[in-house]
Swiss-Prot record:
Expressed in late in the infection. Tegument protein that can bind to various RNA transcripts. Plays a role in the attenuation of selective viral and cellular mRNA degradation by modulating the activity of host shutoff RNase UL41/VHS. Also plays a role in the primary envelopment of virions in the perinuclear space, probably by interacting with two nuclear egress proteins UL31 and UL34. It comes from the Viruses. Residues 18-37 have a biased composition (Low complexity). Phosphorylated by US3. This phosphorylation is required for proper nuclear localization. This is Tegument protein UL47. A motif (Nuclear export signal) lies at residues 95-122, 485-495. Keywords: Host cytoplasm, Host nucleus, Late protein, Transcription, Transcription regulation, Virion, Virion tegument. Residues 1-128, 155-199 are annotated as: Disordered. InterPro entries: Herpes_UL47 (IPR005029). A motif (Nuclear localization signal) lies at residues 10-30. One of its GO terms (cellular component) is host cell cytoplasm. Belongs to the alphaherpesvirinae HHV-1 UL47 family.
Length: 742
């Protein structure tokens, strides 16, 4: 007892049962299961087991070597033959004084041989000698033959003989001047950035090497102006990743996704969905919070006119019946439009496009999965005809891919009834309005949804100004507006050609058995989309020739129509380029889900662009604003290329002639009780709206240098002369047997 503690006993520290049992055991001496396993592995490593040779690889007792052993030795490339003991005067004379300098693949000297006439130290000769040594009935002889063909194609690639043995293949630059009258689509120059490798199945593991010169080109130091789209796309991609990881649990597909009919009987559904995982994209439920956020993002986006646009609704937007006062208000302020006419144009545009589609979808309770399957089936229908995809089923009868003309157009008459899905006629006949379906955009993941929303809003605003400012019965186009619309028609056609061609190649790349073939270098390389619009040097030069023109700059100064179409072009150009770059980035790591989403996003934008060219092509008629002896003009070859492009895009959108568009518009105006009036409105209806200038305008493309020495655009020609070969663009009658002529 301690007196200081008032007689209370001292509390000692409690000891564990382990310490009581083993009082002298150190805690550090305890070993876990992992330590025990490591110790066992270390003991096994100290006693390595001697590898015994296989009995079938043993050398026969009466021979010094075994021929079977040599065969497998050559296949593995482990031959111990020397490479410097063959001293023939012929080979020594060909070596020259600089023998040994540089890469061994750059010399033209024959391969060095091993002593005693052995095989050269290269895989090709080793495979050939192995094939010679094997009997015809050997089970693996066919495997060696296929491997030898692959090695031969890799070691001896085709080159341009006129430019030297080390010169790369020269790529043809494309001109947008069109082709001679009466020659058809077959005489059109080849697409830009494409050489003789359109059907090249050689493996190309580094596709950016062919475009390395673009990084060294000082004229492309800044690359294509993507403005704020890159940052927005990066933020959307990060947000979607976080949502998938922490917010939304993975769900099973809502419905069973069928195989497109164009591929039935040619590929198993499991194999198709492994390459194009549409079932993974169909997992988003219709009432998901992401759909609500997508709808809110559309409603909160700014517009050039400042009004809220009704996109996906079964209710007509508000408007005033009566006179529709088309034409710009006269005054000192530029870029004005009547507010009454703008709201009437919203109702007119809604009825012409998205209104009928939205009501049909709502009435039939159609899920967005059908629209997704429609896009995939129609885009894959053309690509399924490529030799890259059908080579597995038709070995030995491989025909060359279309390396000339407009890509898709080279085989457009081969498949017109492609991949039928329910309501396909409705989707094709809505002027590309699928892009305004919020649930469909959400299915395409974050970045494609953002790009589709951006491009769709730009094209919608441009059409609104076109319908609000002009009418065929009261056109009133000024000279500046006619020139600007002609320039935009040329640029939009060139952009649509490039987008459709990309869809053609990207679909074959997704579905084909050779994803690393040189033929798909265009869609796999990342450098072109970092430096050029849509990865096209021809489109870059066409933009430079158009935007830097003094007449075009004068039109931008005062015309609201020229400004809003410029913003629409920049929006489509930026969104499409970003999606193509996304596809190339995901193709490098073979992320097929994101590749499919980017592919369908480009298809959605291309469908909307082709549908928007119909009202924009009102310029093609003599009724579109002739004042006195003046007549609209258009670039030579533009209408011919547009006609060819309309045939190529038949699976996605149904082309509409001018007469058909006028009749549909006039019928809708009668239903809405609207009447076009060329005079200014009376007092009380004279409220005007001014176009809000944006940083995403066509002026951001000013000040660049062309890449080619020759112009890519043709001269301006009379619209009547250009329509001489294509009267079906106005009347819709007289479809011809050749591509682009009806």
């Amino acid at each position: 007892m301690d007196a200081a503690r008032d007689g209370r006993p001292e509390r000692r520290p409690r000891r564990s049962g382990t310490y009581r049992t083993h009082p002298f055991q150190r805690p550090s001496a305890r070993r876990s299961l992992l330590d025990a396993l490591r110790a066992a592995d270390a003991e096994a490593a100290e006693r390595p087991r001697v590898r015994r040779p296989r009995p079938d690889f043993q050398r026969p007792p009466d021979e010094d070597t075994s021929e079977d052993e040599n065969v497998y030795d050559y296949i593995d490339g482990d031959s111990s033959d020397s490479a410097d003991d063959y001293d023939s005067d012929y080979f020594t004379a060909n070596r020259g004084p600089n023998h040994g300098a540089g890469d061994a693949m750059d010399t033209d000297a024959p391969p060095e041989r091993a002593p005693e006439g052995g095989a050269p130290q290269d895989y090709l000769t080793a495979h050939l000698r192995a094939i010679e040594a094997l009997p015809e009935s050997a089970p693996h002889r066919s495997l060696l033959e296929r491997t030898a063909r692959t090695v031969y194609a890799h070691e001896f690639p085709p080159r341009d003989l006129s430019a030297g043995s080390r010169a790369p293949a020269q790529r043809a630059r494309r001109s947008l001047r069109g082709f001679p009258r009466g020659g058809g689509g077959g005489q059109e120059p080849g697409p830009d950035d494409e050489g003789d490798d359109a059907a090249d199945l050689r493996e190309d593991l580094v596709p950016d090497e062919a475009y390395a010169h673009l990084e060294r080109d000082e004229r492309l130091s800044e690359g294509p102006p993507l403005l704020n789209m890159e940052a927005a796309a990066a933020a959307a991609g990060e947000r979607s990743v976080v949502e998938e990881l922490f917010t939304y649990a993975p769900a099973q597909p809502q419905v069973e996704v069928p195989l497109p009919r164009i591929l039935e009987g040619r590929v198993r559904p499991s194999a198709f969905f492994a390459q194009m995982p549409l079932d993974a994209l169909c997992r988003t439920p219709p009432n998901d919070q992401r759909v609500v956020r997508e709808r809110r993002a559309w409603d909160m986006a700014g517009t050039p006119h400042g009004l809220l646009i009704t996109t996906w609704s079964t209710v007509d937007p508000e408007f005033s019946i009566g006179g529709m006062y088309v034409g710009a208000p006269e005054g000192t302020r530029p870029r004005l439009v009547w507010r009454r006419a703008m709201k009437q144009a919203m109702a007119l545009q809604y009825r012409l496009g998205v209104g009928g589609l939205c009501r049909a979808v709502d009435g039939a309770r159609m899920p967005p999965t059908e629209a997704l399957l429609f896009l995939a089936a129609r885009a894959a229908a053309r690509s399924a005809q490529l030799p890259f995809f059908v080579a597995a089923g038709a070995r030995g009868r491989r025909r060359a891919a279309p390396a000339r003309g407009g890509g898709w157009a080279a085989g457009s008459h081969a498949v017109h009834a492609t991949g039928r899905v329910p309501h396909a006629t409705l989707f094709r006949g809505s002027m590309g309005s699928l892009i305004y379906w919020h649930e469909l955009r959400v299915m395409l993941t974050a970045v494609p949804a953002l790009c589709a929303r951006y491009a769709g809003a730009g094209l919608q605003s441009a059409e609104l100004y076109l319908l609000a400012l002009r009418h065929s019965e009261a056109p009133g186009y000024t000279a500046n507006e006619r020139y600007a619309l002609s320039a935009y028609l040329t640029l939009f056609v060139a952009l649509a050609e490039r987008a459709v061609r990309w869809l053609y190649l990207a679909g074959a790349h997704l579905l084909g058995p050779h994803p690393t073939a040189a033929a798909f270098r265009e869609v796999r390389a990342k450098i072109p989309y970092e430096r050029l619009p849509l990865g096209s040097a021809t489109l870059h030069d066409a933009e430079v020739e158009t935007v830097d023109s003094a007449t075009f700059q004068e039109a931008l100064a005062f015309s609201a129509l020229a400004h809003v179409y410029g913003e629409a072009y920049v929006a489509v150009r930026t969104a499409t380029t970003l999606l193509m770059a996304e596809y190339a980035a995901h193709a490098e790591r073979r992320d097929v889900r994101e590749m499919t989403a980017a592919f369908l996003g480009v298809g959605l934008i291309a469908q909307r662009l082709m549908g928007s060219l119909e009202p924009a092509a009102e310029l093609r008629s003599r009724r579109s604003g002739v004042r006195g002896p003046a007549c609209p003009t258009v670039r030579e070859g533009t209408l011919a290329r547009y006609s060819l492009l309309a045939d190529a895009a038949l699976p996605l959108v149904r082309p509409v002639s001018l007469v058909e568009f006028w009749e549909a518009r006039d019928g809708v105006m009668r239903e809405l009780r609207l009447r076009p009036v060329a005079s200014p409105p009376l007092a009380g209806k004279r409220r005007v709206m001014e176009l809000y200038l944006s940083l995403d305008s066509i002026e951001a493309l000013v000040g660049r240098e062309p890449l080619g020495s020759r112009p890519v655009l043709g001269p301006l020609v009379d619209i009547a002369e250009a329509l001489a070969d294509h009267p079906h663009l106005v009347t819709g009658d007289g479809r011809g047997p050749r591509l682009g002529g009806r």
